[in-house]
């Protein structure tokens, strides 16, 4: 092999090796790019998942807060409505005095437990009615009593309040839910 041929052979080997190195470098560069792209995609997917999870958590927190505020507003509104309804019902008690009140008063007297009732407190309009049912008692008028009566034994050791106001007050926890149901049904 001559000098020229040796140089040509070395050049060919060098070019082949250079081509192989270049080819290997390009393959390695493509592999690195592919790995980097895959990692970037995984990071994007992971980030999107975390973001979606964070958004869902924030949405749940916002919704829970809104539900809590709505519940508080609803409770405050229902409480205010309950007070207004109670006052309205109380102010309407005088209608029970219209027709048949004398019988209602007698029924309230019959509900009293046996006792020596010495003091009877009634609405001023019921003084004569109370005197008929309790001839031996002190009859006292009190304008705050719409109807019914308060009785007590001598010395006040035992007393019974059987006024329309007190009866409504005792029945109110049972009446209110039914009234509210009727109101909501009409809405």
Swiss-Prot record:
Gene Ontology cellular component terms for the protein in this record: proton-transporting two-sector ATPase complex, catalytic domain
What are the protein's UniProt keywords?
A: ATP synthesis, Hydrogen ion transport, Ion transport, Transport
Q: Does the keyword GTP-binding apply?
A: no
Q: Which SUPFAM superfamilies would you find in this protein's record? A: V-type ATPase subunit E-like
Going by the entry's taxonomy, the superkingdom of the source organism is recorded as Bacteria
List, in alphabetical order, the GO biological process terms annotated in this UniProt record: proton motive force-driven plasma membrane ATP synthesis
Tell me which InterPro entries the record gives: ATPase_E_C, ATPase_V1_Esu
Q: Which Pfam families match?
A: vATP-synt_E
Gene Ontology MF: a single term: proton-transporting ATPase activity, rotational mechanism
Briefly, what is this protein's role? Produces ATP from ADP in the presence of a proton gradient across the membrane.
Family to which the UniProt record says this protein belongs: Belongs to the V-ATPase E subunit family.
Its name, as the record gives it, is V-type ATP synthase subunit E
């Amino acid at each position: 092999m001559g000098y020229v041929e040796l140089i040509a052979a070395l050049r060919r080997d060098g070019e082949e090796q250079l081509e192989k190195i270049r080819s290997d470098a390009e393959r390695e560069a493509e592999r690195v790019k592919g790995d980097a792209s895959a990692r970037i995609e995984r990071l994007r997917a992971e980030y999107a998942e975390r973001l979606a999870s964070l958004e869902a958590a924030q949405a749940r927190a916002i919704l829970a807060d809104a539900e809590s505020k709505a519940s508080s507003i609803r409770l405050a509104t229902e409480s205010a409505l309950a007070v207004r309804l109670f006052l309205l019902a109380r102010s309407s008690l005088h209608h029970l005095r219209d027709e048949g009140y004398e019988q209602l008063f007698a029924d309230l007297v019959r509900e009293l437990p046996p006792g020596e009732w010495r003091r009877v407190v009634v609405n001023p309009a019921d003084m004569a009615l109370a005197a008929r049912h309790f001839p031996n008692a002190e009859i006292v008028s009190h304008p705050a009593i719409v109807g019914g009566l308060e009785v007590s034994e001598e010395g006040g050791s035992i007393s019974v309040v059987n006024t329309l106001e007190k009866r409504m007050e005792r029945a109110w926890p049972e009446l209110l839910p039914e009234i509210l149901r009727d109101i909501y049904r009409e809405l």
